[in-house]
Amino acid sequence: MLLLADMDVVNQLVAGGQFRVVKEPLGFVKVLQWVFAIFAFATCGSYSGELQLSVDCANKTESDLSIEVEFEYPFRLHQVYFDAPTCRGGTTKVFLVGDYSSSAEFFVTVAVFAFLYSMGALATYIFLQNKYRENNKGPMLDFLATAVFAFMWLVSSSAWAKGLSDVKMATDPENIIKEMPVCRQTGNTCKELRDPVTSGLNTSVVFGFLNLVLWVGNLWFVFKETGWAAPFLRAPPGAPEKQPAPGDAYGDAGYGQGPGGYGPQDSYGPQGGYQPDYGQPAGSGGSGYGPQGDYGQQGYGPQGAPTSFSNQM
């Protein structure tokens, strides 16, 4: 019963989740940040390496032709030592040089917290979208946290890149041999047999700077969610329409009044078109609807009738 109740809760969460956010840049980049953070702290925090060298004494019975030195994260090399022959009937402890734990641990810590934050932010995007956008506090806090992590990735990746360079120098068998007194004695021969494999550590630095790119790039997508970019994204106002000048369209050189009008002269002017002569008799004579003689003197009025009141007077 308890298992069924738990499954119901899970089903409700899944049903109420907004998984489409994973397809959007804001959520998709968070998934990449989550994955790349895992690679960053896994390749660095789980590292262990080994180097091998040999000491061939003049007295062959005291030689040690296979000295193996192991070291691992967090690279406190000053605590790593191995037994080397003195070629005088005994052995001595030889310690490596350097403590590079601070840069390595700082890098891994940033990666772990980035992993946790990415997972929490992604869960908030999916299941608590309304709470995330309430009062716009979620996007603003998300933007500030993203900016902080971007800066931390820059610092930690740069510090760890320098620390890794120092680790390589400190674990180089040739440099170790130079510091061994027995190797400076005449008749003794010291050789390096195997260098430590540091490809995993190189990968951790690459993932560190990839995380930096992801977090810096994600700043823009989170910034758009805050609404602070709205004033910058607003469309500029359109150009005002040009008002026609008085007399330009319907003025002195108006519609059909001359070369500035819209039609040929005499289209609707006083010299053409329908201009009845109210001085004619009841029939539309003179220059009415048709040419003279069509509806004029042979039309409705009698022939020989006066054509205007002026003729009668």
Curated annotation (Swiss-Prot):
Q: Which GO terms describe its biological process?
A: endocytosis; regulation of long-term neuronal synaptic plasticity; regulation of neuronal synaptic plasticity; regulation of opioid receptor signaling pathway; regulation of short-term neuronal synaptic plasticity; regulation of synaptic vesicle priming; synaptic vesicle maturation; synaptic vesicle membrane organization
Q: Can you cite an annotated GO cellular component?
A: terminal bouton
Location of the MARVEL domain: 21-227
Q: Where is this region: Repeats, Gly-rich?
A: 254-305
Residues modified as Phosphotyrosine: 81
**How does the record classify its membrane topology?**
Multi-pass membrane protein
The positions flagged as glycosylation sites are 59
- Renumbered to this chain, region (Disordered) spans 238-313
Feature: compositional bias, Gly residues: 253-263, 282-302
Q: Which residues lie on this side of the membrane: Vesicular?
A: 50-106, 162-199
The regions listed as transmembrane in this protein's record are 26-49, 107-130, 138-161, 200-223
Q: Where in the cell is it found?
A: Cytoplasmic vesicle, Secretory vesicle, Synaptic vesicle membrane; Synapse, Synaptosome
**Tissues in which the protein is found:** Expressed in the brain, with expression in the hippocampus, the neuropil in the dentate gyrus, where expression is higher in the outer half of the molecular layer than in the inner half, and in the neuropil of CA4 and CA3. Expressed in the putamen (at protein level).
UniProt entry keywords in alphabetical sequence? Calcium, Cytoplasmic vesicle, Disease variant, Glycoprotein, Intellectual disability, Membrane, Phosphoprotein, Repeat, Synapse, Synaptosome, Transmembrane, Transmembrane helix, Ubl conjugation
Biased composition of type Low complexity is found at: 264-281
What biological function has been recorded for the protein in this entry? Answer: Possibly involved in structural functions as organizing other membrane components or in targeting the vesicles to the plasma membrane. Involved in the regulation of short-term and long-term synaptic plasticity.
| Entry's free-text remark on domains | The calcium-binding activity is thought to be localized in the cytoplasmic tail of the protein.
Q: How does it assemble?
A: Homohexamer or homotetramer. Interacts with SRCIN1. Interacts with VAMP2; the interaction is inhibited by interaction of VAPM2 with SEPT8.
The entry sums up its family as follows: Belongs to the synaptophysin/synaptobrevin family.
Q: What's the protein name?
A: Synaptophysin
Q: Which organism is it from?
A: Homo sapiens (Human)
